[in-house]
């Protein structure tokens, strides 16, 4: 293992132990940093002390030429800047060579969501076995509270307060949130808890796989996609789309951007503001359908 790999391994341990980042986030960091390790090795670097701003810029250019999108490149450079900042804090580097290197601005894509009618159809699944009950409970909780996938699979039974209809989740940056989940979600969690012991696990996890272990993020993605097809939804159903749908429907109903920010666990309001564009799309479609002067130019 080279010094390049050794430093990255140390950094990943720091993120896991000190920062307590989720396994999914750690895997993303690892993938981004493996790309720069490969590039640095190809260019003859033996240690990060040999890396300079020119090399980081060349790395960014090469990544773009290989088809990496602007948003993905921004993520890669962000991971690299964080890594170099850590090396500076460890007195391994004097300065961060990635500090002044920026990715081209990514086009702003509005997140896709599921409309209310389709969401009701998705949730109205045929409950014919314990795993279907579990899936219904997961769908209700994710849509009812707008959870991230990592927050859903990380739920333990001790995080529930069913009497008050709330859950505690650990979000990004180890920030805890206490969230309402609604009556339907509470009812389906209770239904699932009645069946959960059939899997014979002593695991603390709320949602279990058929093997009695904490359900994996990949398994949740697979099951949600399968239910989307079974329920006849035209668009691919994935967990983050339920989070987008929660945010969109909450904003359409309440108009309370700050409240939605708190529920989603966004550190910055600007992250939540993208949903105001979705809300405007909804209002514009209502206007075009209903207002007598909407059909302009005719």
Curated annotation (Swiss-Prot):
Its main location: cytoplasm. It is found in: Cytoplasm. Residues 109-288 form the Tyr recombinase domain. GO terms for cellular component: cytoplasm. PROSITE patterns: CB, TYR_RECOMBINASE. GO terms for molecular function: DNA binding; tyrosine-based site-specific recombinase activity. Residues 2-88 form the Core-binding (CB) domain. Gene3D superfamilies: 1.10.150.130, Intergrase catalytic core. FtsK may regulate the catalytic switch between XerC and XerD in the heterotetrameric complex during the two steps of the recombination process. Disulfide bonds: none annotated. Site-specific tyrosine recombinase, which acts by catalyzing the cutting and rejoining of the recombining DNA molecules. Binds cooperatively to specific DNA consensus sequences that are separated from XerD binding sites by a short central region, forming the heterotetrameric XerC-XerD complex that recombines DNA substrates. The complex is essential to convert dimers of the bacterial chromosome into monomers to permit their segregation at cell division. It also contributes to the segregational stability of plasmids. In the complex XerC specifically exchanges the top DNA strands. Belongs to the 'phage' integrase family. XerC subfamily. This is Tyrosine recombinase XerC.
């Amino acid at each position: 293992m080279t010094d390049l790999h050794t430093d990255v391994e140390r950094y990943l341990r720091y993120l896991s132990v000190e920062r307590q980042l989720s396994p999914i986030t750690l895997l993303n960091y690892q993938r981004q940093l493996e790309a720069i390790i490969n590039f640095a090795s190809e260019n003859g670097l033996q240690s990060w002390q040999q890396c300079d701003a020119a090399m980081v810029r060349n790395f960014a250019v090469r990544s773009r030429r290989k088809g990496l999108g602007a948003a993905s490149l921004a993520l890669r450079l962000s991971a690299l800047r964080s890594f170099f900042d850590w090396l500076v804090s460890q007195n391994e580097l004097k300065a961060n060579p990635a500090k002044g290197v920026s990715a081209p601005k990514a086009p702003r894509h509005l997140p896709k969501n599921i409309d209310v009618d389709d969401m009701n159809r998705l949730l109205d699944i045929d409950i014919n076995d314990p795993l279907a009950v579990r899936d219904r409970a997961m769908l209700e909780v994710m849509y009812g509270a707008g959870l991230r996938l990592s927050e859903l699979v990380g739920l333990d039974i001790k995080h529930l307060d069913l009497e008050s209809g709330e859950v505690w989740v650990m979000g990004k940056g180890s920030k805890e949130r206490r969230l309402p989940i609604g009556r339907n979600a509470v009812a389906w969690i209770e239904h699932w808890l009645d069946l959960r012991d059939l899997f014979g696990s002593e695991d603390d996890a709320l949602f279990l796989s058929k093997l009695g272990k904490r359900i994996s993020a990949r398994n949740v993605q697979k099951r949600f996609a399968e239910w989307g097809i079974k329920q006849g939804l035209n668009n691919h159903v994935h967990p983050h789309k339920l989070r987008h749908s929660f945010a969109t429907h909450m904003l359409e109903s309440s108009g309370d951007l700050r409240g939605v920010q708190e529920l989603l666990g966004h550190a910055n309001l600007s992250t939540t503001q993208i949903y105001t564009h979705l809300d405007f799309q909804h209002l514009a479609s209502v206007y075009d359908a209903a207002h007598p002067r909407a059909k302009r130019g005719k």
